Amino acid sequence: MNEKALRVRYQKNKVKKERWKMYDVIIIGAGVSGAAAARELSRYNAKVCVIEKEEDVCCGTSKANSAIVHAGYDAKEGSLMAKLNVRGNALMEQLSKDLDFPFKRIGSLVVCKDEEDMPNLKALYDRGVVNGVPGLRILSKEEVHEMEPNLEDDICAALYAPSAGIVCPFNLNIALAENANVNGVEFKFDTEVTDLKKSGDIWEVHTNQGVFETKYVVNAAGVYADKFHNMVSEKKIHITPRRGDYCLLDKSAGSHVSHTVFALPGKYGKGILISPTVHGNLLLGPTAIDIEDKEGTNTTREGLDQVIAGANLNVKNIPMRQVITSFAGLRAHEDGHEFIIEEVADAKGFIDCAGIESPGLTSSPAIGEMVADLLKEKMHLEEKKDFIATRKGVLNPNTLSKEERAALIKEKPEYENIICRCEMITEGEIIDAIRRPLGAKSLDGVKRRTRAGMGRCQAGFCSPRTMEILARERGVNQSEITKSGGNSKIIVGINKDSL
């Protein structure tokens, strides 16, 4: 029997084997909302599975965004978006300690360039007060320029929100998923949902890897959430992918501003921001372009020009020669501009977690709570006595004292071998990223967990060495290693037998 026939037989057997797998809850999507819901549900005695069409967690909206923990003044008063934003912000600091991911509460500024716009700034302040945002103040021209000397001279005032912060979206998403997995949640990657059917009280989730049965479905599919909602409900929703372009600057530019700087919000969002990142870079963006393509994450010349022009309106002397990469992400914009987190009225057992755009990252811990509370009430779930609430991230030797680092290297010499020179990432960190729960399987998976390849050379130096480690640890040929799963292979084949 040839290789193709064997592969077909294997897939048929796999589908047959998986067909009658039964869960209490299946979550569609391993982005930050799905992972947060999974982590909260892992507190209870329920059989939970997360199904993800990509090869890893954090491969959609959650991987390409502004990485801002918003204060909560922008969302409409009384909206679910406002409530979960403020709650998520309040939860983030303790969560970062429990799950060991980087978070900094640096504060944000919404700047005003014209006295005629002061009523709009005051309205934003008033909305924030109603939403329960702590510590809001309107700063004078002198105060704001003392706080941020690189602001443009014509800025006359600013709304200061000290509770705003910055986070690493990769580490947040990965930490939530890892902790959920350690507490018993299953994750199925490279598994694409193709259909949803109801048989009595049981949902059948049809995928390219088989059929899974569950009592409840949580639809946390990002820009695809409308697709799955509309499969099961007569009341349709529509989600527009809203593309945002970004520029990322080298760490040498990271101190150009010390707060997140916003323009006054407009129809399409919060405008072009300028912000330091938790890792010391400077981030500019995003644009807000509505598109049809749910995979349309290509950058455009026009979009990047808009990012640069928008950033330069509010901050002077931005060292644009220090741009090391650009990227684009998609926001899941629902027509009503509101989070939809509820059981679908005409599809019992189907829970929407849809329309999760900004401030979705900030809100994710609160979204997880809300989804779990909905299901806890319906399923009468009992809390586990052995729930593990904490998690340790990939060890960074640079955070250790000289004595601690020496002891670590003596025990594990791989922590002395620098693989990524730009970010000073060691072989030991990469091995940890691969071996840990839900470990990295691709170059991008390693990058999200360790930052190997995120520095000035953008993996130009370290990618071959990272591929060697991935191949060795996974027991495969280097030609099987991908950039980001699927068909994104880097090596087509060996062109000389001697190699």
What are these regions (language model features)?
Residues 42-64:
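Glycine-rich FAD pyrophosphate-binding loop
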Residues 67-147, 271-272:
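Dinucleotide-binding Rossmann-like beta1-alpha1 core, especially the glycine-rich loop
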Residues 83-86, 111-120, 159-178, 297-302, ...:
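Short beta-strand to alpha-helix junction loop
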Residues 295, 426-437, 460-478:
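Iron-sulfur (Fe-S) cluster-binding segments and ferredoxin-like electron-carrier domains
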